[in-house]
């Protein structure tokens, strides 16, 4: 997918780029698959900010996606490729012979007119087909992977993401995640074949502050620009550095400090992700 750039006729246009939308074939969405989501803008039920730098952003409707892929053994045809404002991947509208319509994540290479099918048993290994991990050959790349059977896909759902099946052990399948983490997933879990499309999304340059405001992202104020009462880095005459290691406003170390709590599922992780040296 091509990235469109602009001539620098304003300073904000100079570095701005957008994805080419020629792959989008639909002019409107299916009404029955749209719903409203309440925008919390980072506030809790008391109206207090619990997650900073968030706002409502542009108005948008949520597209109901079929993450479970539980319409088994019925072949559907891709009727349209659509834009989804709530995710960086494109979505595909699948129409089934009984008239049922569902949205799925569009894997790379899936186009209008192609057929997709989901089954609990084995299927041909084609892009967009969904089946249980135990029926997918070792070495295949998959996306939209369940963590618990029947719960719906939770892993590898962003643009350009995929996991690779590395092997099997007892009732588990070994997956190499997009982060390079190796972990066990129950072989009864469903997954879709292929890589999530729209791979060039990572190369888009936002270019100006207004685009982030439309996305619901507010500006971030540096701690060193605050007063001592507001941040551990605040205060000082003129521009001053931080004393000691950088920390969050609440004193948690900001660079490489582990904050992940232990979980029961930690035993399913074979090896953690590899950190880049830089």
From Swiss-Prot:
Stretches with biased composition (Basic residues): 257-278
Keyword list, A-Z: Ribonucleoprotein, Ribosomal protein, RNA-binding, rRNA-binding
UniProt record, GO biological process: cytoplasmic translation
Transmembrane segments: none
Domain of life: Bacteria
Gene3D superfamilies on file: 2.30.30.30, Nucleic acid-binding proteins (2.40.50.140), Ribosomal protein L2, domain 3 (4.10.950.10)
One GO cellular component term noted in the UniProt record for this chain: large ribosomal subunit
Record GO terms (molecular function): rRNA binding; structural constituent of ribosome; transferase activity
Keyword rRNA-binding assigned: yes
A Pfam match: Ribosomal_L2_C
Region of interest (Disordered), residue spans: 212-278
Keyword Nucleotide-binding in annotation: no
Family to which this protein belongs: Belongs to the universal ribosomal protein uL2 family.
Function comment: One of the primary rRNA binding proteins. Required for association of the 30S and 50S subunits to form the 70S ribosome, for tRNA binding and peptide bond formation. It has been suggested to have peptidyltransferase activity; this is somewhat controversial. Makes several contacts with the 16S rRNA in the 70S ribosome.
Subunit structure: Part of the 50S ribosomal subunit. Forms a bridge to the 30S subunit in the 70S ribosome.
Protein name according to UniProt: Large ribosomal subunit protein uL2
Native source organism of the sequence: Helicobacter pylori (strain Shi470)
Source taxonomy: Bacteria, Pseudomonadati, Campylobacterota, Epsilonproteobacteria, Campylobacterales
Gene: rplB
């Amino acid at each position: 997918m091509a990235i469109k750039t602009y001539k620098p006729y304003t300073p904000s246009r100079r570095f701005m780029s957008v994805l080419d939308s020629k792959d989008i074939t639909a002019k409107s969405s299916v009404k029955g698959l749209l719903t409203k989501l309440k925008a919390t803008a980072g506030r809790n039920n008391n109206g207090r900010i619990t997650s900073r730098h968030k706002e409502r952003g542009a108005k948008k409707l949520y597209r109901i996606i079929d993450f479970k892929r539980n319409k088994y053994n019925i072949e559907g045809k891709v009727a349209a490729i659509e834009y989804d404002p709530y995710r960086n991947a494109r979505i595909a509208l699948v129409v089934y012979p009984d008239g049922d319509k569902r949205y799925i994540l569009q894997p790379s290479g899936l186009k209008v007119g192609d057929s997709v099918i989901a089954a609990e048993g084995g299927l041909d290994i084609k892009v967009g087909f969904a089946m249980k991990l135990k029926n997918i050959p070792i070495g295949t790349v998959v996306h939209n992977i369940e963590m618990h059977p029947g719960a719906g896909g939770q892993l590898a759902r962003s643009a350009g993401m995929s996991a690779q099946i590395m092997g099997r052990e007892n009732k588990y399948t070994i997956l190499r995640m997009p982060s390079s983490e190796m972990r066990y997933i129950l072989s009864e879990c469903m997954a879709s074949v292929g890589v999530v499309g729209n791979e060039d999304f990572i190369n888009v340059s936002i270019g100006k502050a207004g685009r982030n405001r439309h996305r619901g992202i507010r500006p971030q104020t540096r701690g060193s620009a605050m007063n001592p009462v507001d941040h551990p880095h605040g205060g000082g005459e003129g521009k001053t550095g931080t004393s000691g290691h950088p920390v969050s406003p609440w004193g948690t170390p900001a660079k490489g400090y582990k904050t992940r709590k232990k979980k029961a599922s930690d035993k399913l992780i074979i090896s953690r992700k590899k950190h880049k040296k830089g």
